């Protein structure tokens, strides 16, 4: 009886095993392809930039629905600072940038943030100088309240711009009284 059951189940189990192996190999290949695209874009942006960028932090806003009044009143929402970077537009018109900026964080302490940003860019008007974008940024930050240990971050990125002036923004997710911060800056391309 066991031999008959084993013989009956062996073909479907073997097919299932090979199916999972094939899916794992395909997933591994997709991850490698995505990583190769990412590193290629970073390298090309560094080696062949179209512009030099100046960054000026503009606003930090702590989401009022996720903070109590005590925290809101003691946090800094004017992140003065500056930064610089290089950027390019690819053949599809999408933006790629490498940057480093430093600004005053919620506790009014210096916070550096550097990384790579990508935005799919649209130019919906007849005036091609007007554009907006949606994408992501992947970078590293370090904060005073975390002992300035490097912390990686992948965040959403959005922008609206005209010509070489852009208003870029992100949202840092979090928990109650922590994170949930809208952060925006101006970026000029030269």
Swiss-Prot record:
Matching InterPro entries: LipidA_acyl_PagP, OMP/PagP_b-brl
Disulfide links within the chain: none
Pfam families membership: PagP (PF07017)
Active-site annotation: 62, 105, 106
Alphabetized UniProt keyword annotations: Acyltransferase, Cell outer membrane, Membrane, Signal, Transferase
GO cellular component, one term: cell outer membrane
Gene Ontology MF, one: acyltransferase activity
Similarity annotation: Belongs to the lipid A palmitoyltransferase family.
NCBIfam families cross-referenced by the UniProt entry: PRK11045.1
Function: Transfers a fatty acid residue from the sn-1 position of a phospholipid to the N-linked hydroxyfatty acid chain on the proximal unit of lipid A or its precursors.
Oligomer and partners: Homodimer.
Name of the protein this chain belongs to: Lipid A acyltransferase PagP
């Amino acid at each position: 009886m066991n031999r008959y059951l084993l013989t009956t189940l062996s073909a479907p189990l073997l097919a299932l095993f090979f199916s999972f192996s094939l899916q794992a190999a395909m997933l591994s290949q997709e991850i490698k392809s995505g990583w190769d695209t990412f590193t290629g874009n970073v390298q090309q942006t560094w080696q062949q930039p179209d512009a030099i960028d100046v960054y000026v932090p503009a606003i930090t806003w702590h989401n009022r629905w996720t903070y109590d009044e005590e925290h809101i009143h003691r946090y800094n929402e004017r992140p003065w600072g500056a930064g610089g970077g290089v950027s390019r537009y690819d053949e599809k018109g999408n933006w790629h940038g490498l940057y480093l900026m430093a600004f005053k964080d919620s506790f009014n302490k210096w916070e550096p943030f550097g990384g790579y940003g990508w935005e799919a860019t649209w130019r919906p008007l007849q005036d091609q100088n007007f554009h907006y974008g949606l994408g992501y940024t992947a970078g590293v930050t370090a904060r005073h309240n975390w002992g300035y240990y490097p912390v990686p971050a992948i965040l959403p990125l959005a922008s609206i711009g005209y010509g070489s002036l852009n208003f870029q923004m992100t949202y840092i997710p979090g928990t109650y009284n922590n994170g949930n911060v809208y952060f925006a800056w101006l970026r000029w391309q030269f």
